[in-house]
Amino acid sequence: MTNSETLAMFKSSGALLDGHFKLTSGRHSNSYFQCAKVLQYPEYLSAICGEIAAHFRDSGITTVISPAIGGIVVGTEVGRQLGVKTIFAERKEGTMMIRRGFSIDPSEQVLVVEDVITTGGSVVEVMEQVKAAGATVAGVASVVDRSNGKVKLADKQFSLLMMEVVSYAPEECPLCKEGLPIDAPGSRSNAQG
């Protein structure tokens, strides 16, 4: 699947938004990828996650883990297509943790799956949890990489849609300087304001 084919799925499902957004990373942008809107359609979910699963099929993956909340749907479907255990990490009091009775054994080869990577912060936190369990991070995957490959998180890393989408530190944001209202649609928007 090409970048343009993936982008067409986002556009046709209304998942690529234009405006003034506060991203989960805290940075600001004029574009927002609302993956949930494209992933709500089973044919898109299956196709997108099938591409990710195919990329890692021969990598010995035994577990897929995703950061909550955005990565859960993608991670679950990738895990289903790979036929492996699928879990997620979530924040408790601001810290990413493996909870809900989930566990990782030191022998596991773990694929970290996220919906959108901007700075990679959530993925890094999940990777730290995997390493703390003594397991191996065998790869990182995402549906969208907003850095167009500039954010390098693992030796084996794959993103279906690679685009360089400009983002700004809040104090440097030209959209803020223009006085445009900001929207914070990300999964941490309520917790971070």
UniProtKB/Swiss-Prot annotation:
For this UniProt record, give its keywords in alphabetical order, as a comma-separated list.
Glycosyltransferase, Magnesium, Pyrimidine biosynthesis, Transferase
Family in the record: Belongs to the purine/pyrimidine phosphoribosyltransferase family. PyrE subfamily.
The free-text function statement in the UniProt record for this protein reads:
Catalyzes the transfer of a ribosyl phosphate group from 5-phosphoribose 1-diphosphate to orotate, leading to the formation of orotidine monophosphate (OMP).
Pathway membership of this protein? Answer: Pyrimidine metabolism; UMP biosynthesis via de novo pathway; UMP from orotate: step 1/2
| HAMAP family named among the record's database cross-references | PyrE
What InterPro entries does the record tag this protein with? OPRT, Orotate_PRibTrfase_bac, PRibTrfase_dom, PRTase-like
Tell me the protein's name. Answer: Orotate phosphoribosyltransferase
Q: Does the keyword Ribosomal protein apply?
A: no
Q: How does it assemble?
A: Homodimer.
Q: What is the lineage of its organism?
A: Bacteria, Pseudomonadati, Chlorobiota, Chlorobiia, Chlorobiales
Which Gene3D superfamilies does the protein's record reference? 3.40.50.2020
Molecular-function annotations in GO: magnesium ion binding; orotate phosphoribosyltransferase activity
Q: What is the originating organism of this protein?
A: Chlorobaculum parvum (strain DSM 263 / NCIMB 8327) (Chlorobium vibrioforme subsp. thiosulfatophilum)
EC numbers listed for it are 2.4.2.10
Which co-factors does it depend on?
Mg(2+)
